[in-house]
From Swiss-Prot:
Key words of the record: Chloroplast, Membrane, Photosynthesis, Photosystem II, Plastid, Thylakoid, Transmembrane, Transmembrane helix
Pfam short name (any one): PsbH
Transmembrane segments: 29-49
Family listed: Belongs to the PsbH family.
Any one GO molecular-function label of the UniProt entry: phosphate ion binding
Native organism: Porphyra purpurea
Gene Ontology biological-process entries: photosynthesis; protein stabilization
Subunit and interaction comment: PSII is composed of 1 copy each of membrane proteins PsbA, PsbB, PsbC, PsbD, PsbE, PsbF, PsbH, PsbI, PsbJ, PsbK, PsbL, PsbM, PsbT, PsbX, PsbY, PsbZ, Psb30/Ycf12, at least 3 peripheral proteins of the oxygen-evolving complex and a large number of cofactors. It forms dimeric complexes.
Localization (cell): Plastid, Chloroplast thylakoid membrane
Name listed for the protein in its UniProt record: Photosystem II reaction center protein H
Predominant location: plastid
Top-level taxon: Eukaryota
Keyword set includes tRNA-binding: no
Length: 67
């Protein structure tokens, strides 16, 4: 038999929906929006690093990153 702890009792309600699937699309559209925003964030960071996107007073150099 599993050991019952206070923490386990507190966390039990979070696991009550285990195995159940919401009908329809659920939160998939929200996940898609966040994935798109994360992709845009990574794209902007890559462009800044690659100097494709030049910002005033932002110098991308390993020597200046350490100071």
């Amino acid at each position: 038999m599993a050991l019952r702890t206070r923490l386990g009792e507190i966390l039990r309600p979070l696991n009550s929906e285990y195995g159940k699937v919401a009908p329809g699309w659920g939160t998939t559209p929200i996940m898609g929006i966040f994935m798109l925003l994360f992709f845009l964030f990574l794209l902007i960071i890559l462009q800044i690093y690659n100097s494709s996107l030049v910002l005033e007073n932002v110098d991308v150099d390993w020597a200046t990153l350490g100071s």
